[in-house]
């Protein structure tokens, strides 16, 4: 009986490890959750490492690493909370899952765009335009800086 109980306890511990979430923030609009690369659909954040280059912004003639800033803003928001994602489309051209992800029921995409640390990706979605307009009107995040849109940065890099 004790042996059976020991096996059962070990089995339960193994199950918990098997279902534990592993999360790594890749950049301001991409995470790796349980080994799956997930790209936040409908938004675009500054690049922290695109072909070996990091996107920068200017504020009062000071260079700001806005790619890293966006990533850090996302890391801080997630903290130790559980991230859940709702798949929206087929994987993109880079084989990333496209999804909207949430922490405590709050959209991380909306949080990033409304805070000025990502942009509504109008080419693919109209969902976050109002949030971008709010950030722009209030000069939040990158809207307080001189910046290049991420899609333009990628074209010139």
Set out the residue ranges of the language-model regions.
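Small beta-barrel nucleic-acid-binding modules, primarily SNase/OB-fold domains
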Residues: 4-157
């Amino acid at each position: 009986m004790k042996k059976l109980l020991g096996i059962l306890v070990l089995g339960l511990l193994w199950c918990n490890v098997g279902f534990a979430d592993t999360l790594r923030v890749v950049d301001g609009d991409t995470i790796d959750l349980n080994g799956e690369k997930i790209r936040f659909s409908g938004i675009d954040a500054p690049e922290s490492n695109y072909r070996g280059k990091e996107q920068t912004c200017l504020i009062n003639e000071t260079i700001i690493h806005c790619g890293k800033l966006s990533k850090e803003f996302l890391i801080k928001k997630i903290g130790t909370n559980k991230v859940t994602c709702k798949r929206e489309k087929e994987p993109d051209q880079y084989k990333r899952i496209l999804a909207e992800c949430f922490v405590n029921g709050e959209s991380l995409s909306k949080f990033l765009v409304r805070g000025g640390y990502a942009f509504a990706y109008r080419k693919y979605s109209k969902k976050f335009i109002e949030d971008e307009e709010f950030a722009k009107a209030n000069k939040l995040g990158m809207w307080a800086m001189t910046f290049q849109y991420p899609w333009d940065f990628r074209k010139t890099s």
